[in-house]
Every structure is written in C-alpha cells, then in structure tokens.
Amino acid sequence: MTNIRKTHPLLKIINNSLVDLPAPSSLTSWWNFGSLLGVCLGVQILTGLFLAMHYTSDTATAFNSVTHICRDVNYGWLLRYLHANGASMFFICLYLHVGRGLYYGSYTYSETWNIGILLLFAVMATDFMGYVLP
C-alpha cells in the first residue's frame, strides 16, 4: 500500500514540492535566509498597514496615537512589537543573506550580485527615510 501523500492529487503536488524536493546535498540552512527575508517583509508590510490605520503623524497627537494603539486596539501592542522586532529580524536575515553570498563566492555572478547590491542600498535608503528621519 502506498502513502496517501504520493497518490492523492492535491497532496501529491505538496509532496513533490516540499517533502520529496530534489535538492542537492550541499543545500544547508544558510540558504533559508532568502525565504526568511520574504516572510519578514510580509510581516513588516502587514503590521505596518495595520499600525498606519491608527497612527497620526501630527506632533501634538503622535504619542497619544501610539498609546491608543497599545491600549485600545485589539492586540495593538503585539502589532507594534512585531513591527519593531520584525525590522531587526529583517536586517539580521539581510546581512546573513549577503554574508552567505560573500562566503560562497556569489559575487562572481556579476549581474545578479549587482542587482542584489542595488536592492540592498534601496532597502537601506528606504529604512533611513522611514525610520530614522521622522
């Protein structure tokens, strides 16, 4: 009798892409940081949108809106802490992702490496404009 994950049409797709994925043995945990960057970015976008629904940037009411988010919004404190810690986790994953590329010599693929460096500078400029300057 064969496994249901290999015979069921829907589970077969999931099995072939996640469980029995034909991947090289040199694929280590260092290669997960690209997908972790995607997860962190998704969390940042979602929590940022939900926080922006209640935040006011006026200098007279900005602090009051932050306390409103933490006290009155359902799980507002969780959104705020996920957004703050998600930014730190995003940069940790970003630097580890670039470090892995340096370690394995990915800079020899000049076109891909240059696009990655441009993305790195764009992310750093965006974060500087959005988090440091205000």
Swiss-Prot record:
It holds the Pfam family Cytochrome_B. The chain crosses the membrane at residues 33-53, 77-98, 113-133. Keywords: Electron transport, Heme, Iron, Membrane, Metal-binding, Mitochondrion, Mitochondrion inner membrane, Respiratory chain, Transmembrane, Transmembrane helix, Transport, Ubiquinone. Belongs to the cytochrome b family. GO terms for cellular component: mitochondrial inner membrane. GO terms for biological process: mitochondrial electron transport, ubiquinol to cytochrome c. Binds 2 heme b groups non-covalently. InterPro entries: Cyt_b/b6_N (IPR005797), Cytb/b6-like_sf (IPR027387), Cytochrome_b_N_euk/bac (IPR048259), Di-haem_cyt_TM (IPR016174). Heme b b566 binds at residue 97. Heme b b562 binds at residue 83. This is Cytochrome b. Heme 1 (or BL or b562) is low-potential and absorbs at about 562 nm, and heme 2 (or BH or b566) is high-potential and absorbs at about 566 nm. GO terms for molecular function: metal ion binding; ubiquinol-cytochrome-c reductase activity. It comes from Sturnira tildae (Tilda's yellow-shouldered bat). CDD domains: Cytochrome_b_N. Component of the ubiquinol-cytochrome c reductase complex (complex III or cytochrome b-c1 complex) that is part of the mitochondrial respiratory chain. The b-c1 complex mediates electron transfer from ubiquinol to cytochrome c. Contributes to the generation of a proton gradient across the mitochondrial membrane that is then used for ATP synthesis. Its cofactor is heme b. The keyword Acyltransferase does not apply. Its main location: mitochondrion. It is found in: Mitochondrion inner membrane. The cytochrome bc1 complex contains 11 subunits: 3 respiratory subunits (MT-CYB, CYC1 and UQCRFS1), 2 core proteins (UQCRC1 and UQCRC2) and 6 low-molecular weight proteins (UQCRH/QCR6, UQCRB/QCR7, UQCRQ/QCR8, UQCR10/QCR9, UQCR11/QCR10 and a cleavage product of UQCRFS1). This cytochrome bc1 complex then forms a dimer. It comes from the Eukaryota. It is a multi-pass membrane protein.
